Curated annotation (Swiss-Prot):
Residues 48-107, 117-129 have a biased composition (Low complexity). Its main location: secreted. PANTHER family: PTHR31836, SRCR DOMAIN-CONTAINING PROTEIN-RELATED. Residues 1-20 form the signal peptide. GO terms for cellular component: extracellular region. This is Allergen Asp f 7 homolog. Residues 48-161 are annotated as: Disordered. Glycans are attached at N268. Keywords: Allergen, Glycoprotein, Secreted, Signal. It is found in: Secreted.
Amino acid sequence: MAPQFLKALTVATALGATLATALPVQPKPTVWHTTTQVVVKTITKTATVHGTPGPDYTVPPAYTTPAAPTVPTDAPQQPSYTPVPSAPTPSSSSSYSAPAEPSSSSVPAPPPPPPTTTSTPAPEPTTSTTPPPPPPAMTTPPPPPPPPATKPPVVSIPPIGGGGSTYTGPCAAGSPCTGEITFYDGGLGACGTNIDTNGEDAIALPIELMGPLSNNNPYCGKQVQISYKGKTATATVKDKCAGCTGNNIDMTRFLFYKLIRFPVAFTNSSNSGVEADGRIHGVEWHFI
């Protein structure tokens, strides 16, 4: 009986030693736990602005940033095993986990909105301005009366007799006038009749002698005797010469040729050279 008990005890002891040798001691695992804490700070600044206040404005509530979620950190799991029961030496493993710190986020309450200040501007003083009196009305003087119409000078024409010894005006038979003679083409004369320069004996007296009167001029129709170097001709006053001065007279071609080449009959061919003489000097004439 004793030998069997010892044998059994020896076997159990050997088995326990074998198990103790085969299973090493497991180290204690280290578990790390990370905690993230978000802190939001609100800073209130007050600024004073000088000037004209604007319209009322309501400040909206401050924006609150949500707290970041806490992410738990899982420790790695150790492989599970089933220990072989041993008699005297039990295998034990202990795991230490650090306590997790509570996650807290403190968000300060938004500051109260500033009081609304309404300023009423002071009324501006009313200035009463009296307009200046209107300027005096300008009185326009009446226009000066128009000058009296200028009347043409009255030319005193000496009375003209019926001719001969009864004529008492200038260039009479007893005191003939001496001047120059020229010729012209005739046409409508100042006395109101046409003048044929190639077919009649007609003259134009100087304007200084006849005056401004034309159709009813007393000299119109009077007879004049003209003498030049022994040649004498009688002509009728039918026109007025505006370019003649002094005692110079103008006449038709027909009369001019008669005085220059008399008694040769007047023809265009025989008297063509006479026109080159132009103005003839030293001619006497008088009314008859």
